[in-house]
């Protein structure tokens, strides 16, 4: 924050609108590419961050950046930097209904040699705005691209949903078409409390959750479903994850551990709360009651995940295996344009 420079002060001439800041450099981390700046963002310059060590290997496969508008509270670069500090084996960015931050994500990850997984969390309820509500309704579907073809298919599916809705901020996915759109190139995680499995469990107990899991398997294929166990340090995490793991075992599908991160580190918690309040157009005290897990929605090391999920080491191991199977470099999907001579001048 700028302070101590009143309009017309001796060290900075002012105007009737405040101090003249035209010569001041942009704040670090703003990218220099906001509408307020006339220059383009420069190349990412990696900090000298030592890779953390963890006795337990782990990769995060469900994380939101600030490109999940007013939901994620850390830029993609910050997520990568924190993943480096924690010693994560790979990182996925799964923003809501878009790939808006993946170039920044991929550039930062490349500097640290970190494998990248690309995905998105789809909002399946049609024509529902995410703003102006404490807890926007609707079911979510978390999709990871298994490879470049999966990325292309997911990108096309998201673009179609935006175009069909025809209004900014609204989407309309064709649920029947989703079943075929992946073509074996998507991996479906059952997601957070907004996912079909958790919603069914919360509303109808184990019988409803069993039915929801069967429907997911029938829709997307047995080999394309993984039951997500979220670790956010909540009092009921153990009980809920035990039930979910039992459902997965009964259906013969694997589990995977995630944090459902919405910011890089605990220091961003207050910012995340403030952004959620802005999204809901309410105050922090009100929104806090709707976000019980926000305090723990940050990246964690493998050692910490092992402490939070002591009964599910296989879910932690599976995160590493899935990341290894799904990771690819963004350059692999760059368009191969023909060479074109450009005259001088």
Task: For each feature predicted by the language model, list its residue ranges.
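Phosphodiester-processing cores and adjacent nucleic acid-binding clamps
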Residues: 1-345
């Amino acid at each position: 924050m700028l302070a101590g420079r009143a309009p017309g002060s001796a060290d900075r001439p002012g105007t009737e609108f405040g101090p003249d800041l035209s010569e001041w450099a942009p704040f670090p981390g703003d990218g220099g590419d906001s509408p307020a700046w006339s220059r383009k963002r420069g190349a990412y310059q990696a900090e000298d961050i030592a890779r953390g060590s963890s006795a337990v290997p782990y990769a995060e496969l469900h994380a939101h950046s600030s490109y999940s508008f007013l939901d994620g509270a850390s830029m993609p670069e910050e997520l990568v930097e924190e993943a480096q500090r924690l010693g994560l084996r790979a990182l996925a960015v799964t923003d809501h209904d878009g790939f808006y931050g993946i170039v920044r994500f991929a550039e930062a990850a490349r500097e640290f040699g970190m494998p990248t997984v690309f995905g998105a969390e789809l909002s399946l309820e049609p024509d529902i705005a995410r703003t102006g509500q404490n807890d926007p309704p609707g079911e979510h579907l978390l999709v990871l691209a298994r490879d470049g073809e999966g990325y292309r298919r997911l990108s096309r599916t998201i673009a179609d949903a935006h175009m069909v809705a025809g209004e900014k901020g609204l989407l309309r996915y064709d649920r029947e078409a989703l079943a075929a759109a992946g073509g074996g190139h998507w991996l479906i995680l059952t997601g957070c409390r907004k996912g079909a499995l958790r919603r069914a469990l919360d509303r109808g107990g184990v019988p409803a959750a069993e039915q929801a899991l069967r429907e997911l398997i029938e829709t997307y294929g047995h080999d394309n479903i993984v039951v997500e166990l979220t670790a956010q340090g909540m009092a009921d995490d153990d009980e809920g994850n035990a039930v979910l793991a039992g459902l997965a075992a009964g259906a013969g599908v694997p589990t995977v551990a995630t944090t459902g991160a919405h910011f890089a580190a605990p220091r961003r918690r207050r910012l995340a709360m403030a952004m959620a309040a802005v999204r809901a157009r309410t105050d922090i005290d009100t929104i806090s009651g709707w976000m019980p897990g926000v305090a723990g929605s940050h990246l964690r090391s493998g050692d910490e995940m092992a402490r939070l999920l002591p009964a599910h080491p296989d879910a932690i191991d599976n995160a590493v295996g899935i990341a290894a199977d799904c990771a690819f470099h963004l350059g692999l999907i760059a368009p191969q344009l023909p060479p074109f001579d450009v005259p001088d001048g």
